[in-house]
Amino acid sequence: MEVQLGLGRVYPRPPSKTFRGAFQNLFQSVREVIQNPGPRHPEAASAAPPGARLQQQQLQQQETSPRRQQQQQQQPSEDGSPQVQSRGPTGYLALDEKQQPSQQQSAPECHPESGCTPEPGAASAASKGLQQQPPAPPDEDDSAAPSTLSLLGPTFPGLSSCSTDLKDILSEAGTMQLLQQQQQQQQQQEAVSEGNSSGRAREATGAPISSKDSYLGGSSTISDSAKELCKAVSVSMGLGVEALEHLSPGEQLRGDCMYAPLLTGPPSVRPTPCAPLAECKGSLLDDGPGKSNEETAEYSPFKAGYTKGLDSESLGCSSGGEAGGSGTLELPSALSLYKSGALDDVAAYPSRDYYNFPLALAGPPPPPPPPHPHARIKLENPLDYGSAWAAAAAQCRYGDLASLHGGGAPGPGSGSPSATSSSSWHTLFTAEESQLYGPCGGGGGGSAGEAGAVAPYGYTRPPQGLAGQEGDLAIPDIWYPGGVVSRVPYPSPSCVKSEMGPWMESYSGPYGDMRLEPTRDHVLPIDYYFPPQKTCLICGDEASGCHYGALTCGSCKVFFKRAAEGKQKYLCASRNDCTIDKFRRKNCPSCRLRKCYEAGMTLGARKLKKLGNLKLQEEGEASSATSPTEEPAQKLTVSHIEGYECQPIFLNVLEAIEPGVVCAGHDNNQPDSFAALLSSLNELGERQLVHVVKWAKALPGFRNLHVDDQMAVIQYSWMGLMVFAMGWRSFTNVNSRMLYFAPDLVFNEYRMHKSRMYSQCVRMRHLSQEFGWLQITPQEFLCMKALLLFSIIPVDGLKNQKFFDELRMNYIKELDRIIACKRKNPTSCSRRFYQLTKLLDSVQPIARELHQFTFDLLIKSHMVSVDFPEMMAEIISVQVPKILSGKVKPIYFHTQ
C-alpha cells in the first residue's frame, strides 16, 4: 500500500485515491467526478425534500459510532447560529459549503432522540434562512485526518463550489497543524480582549469549543500565515490569487475557482462546480484575473487558436437552483480570461493588428454573444480584418495585399474581373520559390487586358501565361554584356517588392528622400511610415528644430557651430565609438562631432538654403522677363551653386565616417616567417572587415538597400576596398615604396618574397604608385572608395536591383561633380573622369588574384600553420568560390 507524505505525519490513503504526480491527481479526480458524480455533491443533498433529509439524518446518527459522534460537534457561525462540521466518506475534512437560503425550514432541525436542544442563537439563524448541513456517513475512522482546507473556506470562497473529490486532493496531511498552537494562543487572547457575543453564548450554554473555533478564534478571518498557505495552495493548483489580495472576504470573490463558476448570477444560470476539463485547461493558459481588455487583446489570436478545437463543444454548466430548478449558460470556447464586472465598459481593440498577421478570413467574424450581466468572464472578440485590413496590408512587403481590405477596391479573389486573371498570384508569396520578386503593388481592380500596366516602379506585369514563370526577365548575361556597363539596362521582372523594412532608415543628406519616389502609390499617408522625428539625431534629447541641416537640440547646435568653426582638433581617447546620449554627450567631443557630420550637419546648410531661395527668385524673374539679359542671369545663378557645391554635404559625411588606423597586432621582434606574416594579415583583415561594415552602414543611402543586398555587397567587395585603402595609406605614409598594411605591419621587398605572394604585392604597389602619378585628392579617394563598394554584384542580380542601380549612379554623379568642381573645361573633366574610372577598374583584377590566393591558402592552412579567424574563414569558404566560379562579377567602366 502506498502512503502520502504530508506536512504533519504519515497517514494512509484510500486505495482508490492513490495517484502518482500532481497534475495526474488533479485531472484524474476531476475526470472521476464528472463521470461518477455520486451523492457527494452538495446539490444532491440540498435538492432532497426536508422529510427525506430528516430520515437520512436519523439513519446516519444511529449508525454513527460513539467516538464518531464526539467528533461531530456543532460550531456556531459568525452570527451565533450553529453549524455542523461533517466529514466526507473518504475520511477527510470537507470544505465548508455556502448554505443556500431556504424558505422551507424555519427552525434548526434536530432529532428528538438525540436530546439536543437548540442554542440561543439558533432562532436568529433560523429567521435568516440558514440551515444545517447533515453529516455524511463515514466509511472508516478518520480521526487522524487533517483539517486543512476546511479552514480556508472563508478566505477562498471560490473553492466552496468545487467537488468533494477535488477537496480531498487539496486536503493534504496536517498542513495547518503546524500553526494550530500559535493560532490557539492568539484566539485565547482575542477571546479575552474582545469578548464577542458568540463566545459569551458558548460560555452560557456550556457548549464545547470545536477545533475550528479554537483555530479561527470564532471569526471567519485567518492569520497571515494561513493566507500565505492559501496562496501557495492556489498557485500549486494554477489558480489566480491576485484578485484575492485587494478584495475583502465579504465581497464574495466567486468565479476565481479553478473552474470559474458564475456564482454571482441568478440561480437559473449558476453552473455546477464540475466544469468541463477543457474549460479548466483553457483557464490555466490565461495570465490571471487582473488583466485589462486592452492588454489581453494582443494575445487573443493565440488563445483563440488554442481553443479552436473546442468550438463545437458547449462549455456551459447546469446546476440546481434554490427550489430545485436548473439553468444552463452557454459560453464560447475562447472565454477563458476572467475580469471583474467593473471592467466590462472598457472597450477592447478588436481591429488592432499588433503583429501584422496577414490572416485570410473567409468571411466576417461572427458577433460575440452578449455577456451575462453578472458574468465575470471576459468576452474575447475575434480580430476584425474589415476596415483595418488596409493598414495591415500597407505594411506588408507586397503591394497586392492592399487590394484585400474592405475599402471598396476590388482585388483578386473578391469577385471582381481581376480575380480570374490574378488567381495564380498568391497574396503573400510568389508562384515559384526561385522568383526574385513578389507581386507588384498595383491597383486591385485590374483585368486581364491590363496585365501590362505600369507598376509603381516602372515595371510591367506579365500576362497570365507568364504569371508563374520568370516573365520577361532578361538573361543575366545581358545585364552586363562583356563585363562593361555604362548604365545598367533595367530588366522588366514580372513583379517587384515594395520594400519598406526597418533597414530603410531615413537620412538627412542629399539621398535621404531617394526612396520617396513620386510614382510610388501609398495606401496610407507618408507620415504613417515615417512619423516626424521629435528627438535630436545626435544625443537623443528633445529636438528644438532643424539646425545646420539636421534635426538637433540646442546644445548640439551650439556645439557643432563652435567645433566646426574652431581650429581645435579633437581626438578620441577610446576607439572612436563612444556613446553619445543626453547624459554623456560632453564626454567625447570627437565622437560627438563625428556623429554631427554623420547626421548631415554642415556650416553651409544655411547658405545653401539662402542660395536655393535666391535661385528660385532669379528663375522666377528670368521667366517673367523678356530682356536679352535672361541667359547671363541663369549662368550666374548656376555658377554660384556650382561654386558652393565644391564642398558638399556628401564629402563632409565621407570624411566623418572614414575608418581610423587599424593595427594588425604583429610582433616585429620575432623573425619574419611565412606563417607569422600571413596569420597577421588574416587577423588584420578581420579587424578591418569590422570597420568596413560600420563604414558601409553609415554611407548615405546604403540602408535603402534590402538587408540581404547589404550583406552581399559587403561580402563581395571587402577585398577590393581593403586593397584600395591600403594603396592610399602606402601613398600617403611611405610614398608607395612599401606596402603599408598597418603601422605594425609594413611589407618591404624581403617580406614580399617571404610571404610567397610577391606578384600580388607588386601589383598592389603599382596601384599605390598610381595615386601619386594621377595626383589623387583626398576627396576623389573618398568618393572612389565609396563607389568601389557598389562595383561587384551577382550575375543573377540582387533582390532590390533598382535601388542598387540608382545608388550606384548617384555616387558616379558625385564623383563627376567633385571632378568638375575645380575644372571649368569640359574636356579636362572628361579626361579626369576617364583616368579615375580606369584606376577603379584596375582594382578588380588585383582583388581576384588575392581571392584565389586566400582560398588556396585556406584549403591548406592546416599544413602551413596559418591561422584564419572565424569570420574570415566563413567568408572565404562561402563567398569567394562564387566570385571565382563567375557567379559574381565586377562591374567595369571600360572594356577589359
Curated annotation (Swiss-Prot):
Q: Kindly list the biological process annotations in GO that this record carries.
A: androgen receptor signaling pathway; intracellular receptor signaling pathway; male gonad development; negative regulation of extrinsic apoptotic signaling pathway; nuclear receptor-mediated steroid hormone signaling pathway; positive regulation of cell population proliferation; positive regulation of gene expression; positive regulation of transcription by RNA polymerase II
Arranged from A to Z, the UniProt key words for this protein are: Cytoplasm, DNA-binding, Isopeptide bond, Lipid-binding, Lipoprotein, Metal-binding, Nucleus, Palmitate, Phosphoprotein, Receptor, Steroid-binding, Transcription, Transcription regulation, Ubl conjugation, Zinc, Zinc-finger
Gene3D superfamilies reported for this sequence = Erythroid Transcription Factor GATA-1, subunit A (3.30.50.10), Retinoid X Receptor (1.10.565.10)
Q: Which residues bind DNA?
A: 535-608
Q: Where is this site: Interaction with coactivator FXXLF and FXXFY motifs?
A: 874
The region called Interaction with ZNF318 is annotated at 1-563
Chief subcellular site?
A: nucleus
List of residues that carry Phosphoserine: 65, 81, 248, 627
Modifications made to the protein after synthesis: Phosphorylated in prostate cancer cells in response to several growth factors including EGF. Phosphorylation is induced by c-Src kinase (CSK). Tyr-511 is one of the major phosphorylation sites and an increase in phosphorylation and Src kinase activity is associated with prostate cancer progression. Phosphorylation by TNK2 enhances the DNA-binding and transcriptional activity. Phosphorylation at Ser-65 by CDK9 regulates AR promoter selectivity and cell growth. Sumoylated on Lys-378 (major) and Lys-497. Ubiquitinated. Deubiquitinated by USP26. 'Lys-6' and 'Lys-27'-linked polyubiquitination by RNF6 modulates AR transcriptional activity and specificity.
Q: Where is this region: Disordered?
A: 35-152, 178-218
> Would you tell me the Gene Ontology cellular component terms?
chromatin; cytoplasm; nucleus
Question: Where does the record say this protein resides?
Answer: Nucleus; Cytoplasm
The similarity comment for this entry is:
Belongs to the nuclear hormone receptor family. NR3 subfamily.
Query: What is the purpose of this protein?
Result: Steroid hormone receptors are ligand-activated transcription factors that regulate eukaryotic gene expression and affect cellular proliferation and differentiation in target tissues. Transcription factor activity is modulated by bound coactivator and corepressor proteins like ZBTB7A that recruits NCOR1 and NCOR2 to the androgen response elements/ARE on target genes, negatively regulating androgen receptor signaling and androgen-induced cell proliferation. Transcription activation is also down-regulated by NR0B2. Activated, but not phosphorylated, by HIPK3 and ZIPK/DAPK3.
Q: What's the name of the protein?
A: Androgen receptor
Query: Source gene?
Result: AR
